[in-house]
Amino acid sequence: ELPIFAFTHCRDVVVAVSRAGGIGVLGAAGFTPEQLGQELDWISARLGDKPFGIDVIMPKKFESGDVPDLQSMIPERHKAWVEEVLARHGVAPLPADAGAGAHHGISGEQIGWTHELCRRLLDVAFGYPGVKVMVNALGTPPADVLAECRERGILVGALAGKVKHALAHRQ
């Protein structure tokens, strides 16, 4: 009804915006697939047939890879700098058994940056008829995701940091 989109991690905001005629878009990267299903159940129960969206973080260039691969890509000097900043400000280190994604609030899971992890989130989201928009925070999604969205009648949006990115999205 209105050209208003609200990107949020808060299900209450998704519902409020969609009820008001806009499109509430839930940021999914911080959830496990199970948690996302619970959030989408809650949203769907309150919106009925009103549309809403899901926002993922899926790099087109990383169509495979697991958490250790991504962790190994972080330069040691960056890790040392983060540790120094945390120590300087008195932030306690995480317990050794906290899991790879604990700093994102995800027990034992990496934030959904890989194709595999993000696909699991999308598989959950695509099971909800109210999901009418899928937005990728890292540009054009991989071809298989675009194809599935088209097949399901789901609109696709993507971040465009430069004009060349916006032009690429048109294709």
Which ranges hold each PLM region?
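Active-site entrance/lid segments in N-terminal catalytic domains of soluble metabolic enzymes
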Residues: 1-171
